[in-house]
């Protein structure tokens, strides 16, 4: 069973590690797109900072989440990606980018699948190397 899960696990882990990482880096270069255009006017009006500054903060979060997934925090990182993509989708719906919102919701399903496959592989939410062997979320 573990071999079969690996065929699913590794492509998902690499994808959901690299995509947020690269998207986060692109928040500083805008090579892929000008990300500020995707912030809905409703969201922009609630920000206590410029949209550009907000997108830089978003970039940092995406870089950290991508690294977490790539470095073995896959089960927890996958769930963070699910929540992150759901929030992005809500913003995109408010901005009228329905096609992109649907794409991000589909990606959220894939991230959920990654987290569930990691759970099936008996991965902890936080790898033991990060906790010095202590299992902070272990079931009693």
Where are these regions (language model features)?
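Extended, low-polarity transmembrane helix blocks
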Residues: 1-33, 48-60, 64, 70-140
């Amino acid at each position: 069973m573990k071999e079969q899960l690996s065929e699913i696990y590794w492509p998902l882990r690499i994808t959901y590690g690299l995509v947020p990482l690269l998207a986060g880096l692109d928040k500083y270069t805008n090579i892929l797109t000008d990300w500020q255009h995707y912030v809905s006017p409703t969201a922009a009006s609630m920000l206590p900072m410029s949209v550009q500054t907000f997108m830089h903060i978003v970039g940092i979060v995406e870089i950290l989440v991508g690294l977490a997934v790539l470095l073995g925090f896959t089960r927890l990182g996958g769930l963070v990606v699910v929540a992150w993509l759901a929030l992005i989708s809500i913003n995109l719906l408010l901005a009228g980018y329905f096609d992109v919102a649907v794409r991000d919701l589909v990606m959220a399903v894939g991230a959920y699948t990654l987290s569930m496959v990691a759970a099936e592989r008996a991965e902890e939410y936080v790898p033991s190397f990060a906790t010095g062997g202590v299992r902070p979320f272990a079931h009693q």
